[in-house]
């Protein structure tokens, strides 16, 4: 599914709203799932655990700020590049939110070796 500017705005807004609620509850935003092009469950588990235990300043704020500045044809924000370099990510980053009706909506950011964003897309898993 190709992403329009309107779709992207809606998804970013929703991510920010979920993040605000989670930060009020004192929990970090564990729905961020980073993955390689082929999913390695161990990698996903490792990242999830890292985020749960991390003492990063307000993860929800950190990632949402970064996601707001992701644009096709531009380099990934330095905060995201630095985070991903710690874990040797390949060419894709995925931000997922689980909705109440058991659907998972993901913003998929694909980038090249120079960390320039090649494509933004939305995937919905039911």
Predicted regions and their residues:
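Short helix/turn-capping signatures at newly exposed starts of structured segments
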Residues: 1-93, 102-104, 113-126
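Phosphate/anion-contacting hairpin/loop surfaces
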Residues: 96
